[in-house]
Amino acid sequence: MALYRTARRPLQMMLFSRLGNPEQNYSSWARKDASQSAFGMFVRLFSAHAPAAAEQMSLIKQLRERTSAPIKDVKASLVDCNWDIEAAQKDLRKRGKVLASKKSGRAATEGLLALAQNEGKAALIELNCETDFVARNDIFQCLALSLAKQALLTENTAQQASGIHPVGPECLEDLMINLEHPKISGETTVQNAITEVAAMMGENVKLRRGFVMSTSLPGVLSTYLHTSPQPGLGRIAGLLSLEIEDGNSQLDVLHHVGSELAMHVVAAKPLFLTKELVSSDALESEREILKSQAESTGKSQMAIEKMVEGRLRKYYEEVVLMEQKFIINDAVNVKTVLNNLSKEVGSPVKIGSFFRMEVGEGIQRLEATSADEPVAQAA
């Protein structure tokens, strides 16, 4: 028996050395077990308030479809709002307005022109964004078309006269607009709609400018949009009004020729309607350039003057609409096209005004020149 006790003592000492004092060890186990129980209770309580993983994914998908916001923002708003989808949608709008405000200083050189038109009147606006990816988005395009329709509805004393009249952002931003899109529907102000779309797209979205063209009846107003993703949208626009003395003339013929002339305006980029309307500054500048070029030939003064006059005629053919070669048939100029049209309809036809605008022109330059701004001129 004594031998047995003696043999057992080293084994006990080895166990004690590894486990420590049994009483102390029991106390540490109790504390550890209690802490694990408390953590387990916390996890169970938290899990009782958060939906299951499948339901979470469903809520994220629903809110993503409603708002088109990035998934990480959608999930963050849902978590912050205890997975209440309505509250999360409001939270996303607040986040979006802050984000849109931060991005408002970034250059927005892409975008679209949107056109709305009725009898004798057309409105053209430019809505900018940062990338052509956003310009292709259907929400962005819906906003652009809605803004053009709103611009068409504006009325002021200046617009009652024929010609081209500016409709700047300040004229539109406080007006109410109804966006007919499932992800951004409802009535709100123009400025709020732009801010909300900017938040959804994650880019700076800006209404840059707008114009209204009107014509007195009888007459037609023709338009052409280049690089058009859908009717009413494009990157380059040409507008042109044809006026006729006899209101009973063949208006369908006028519409056809007017559409071709609007296309011509986009392609040929005229700066002036007639030679008489060429600005004195532009003419003097061109004359000085041509004279300097002619003098370098070393010819007589009389020969130099003839060279300058000949080259001025070429200049008129480049920048004056009535003198330009018609893009549909370059055997004739635009003036001849109008003369032939007048004979066909049996009444004099003239161009009342024309207008050309392109997305992003002049934005990236510090000083805009005549080539950087929309070209418009009336007779």
From Swiss-Prot:
- What's the superkingdom here? Eukaryota
| Endpoints of the signal sequence | none
Which BP terms does GO give this entry? mitochondrial translational elongation
Residue span of the annotated presequence: 1-45
Its chief place of residence is mitochondrion
Is Protein biosynthesis among the key words of this record? yes
Asked whether the UniProt record includes Mitochondrion among its keywords, one would answer yes
Q: Which family does it belong to?
A: Belongs to the EF-Ts family.
Q: Which organism is it from?
A: Ricinus communis (Castor bean)
Any idea what this protein is called? Elongation factor Ts, mitochondrial
Q: Which GO terms describe its cellular component?
A: mitochondrion
The molecular function GO annotations come to: translation elongation factor activity
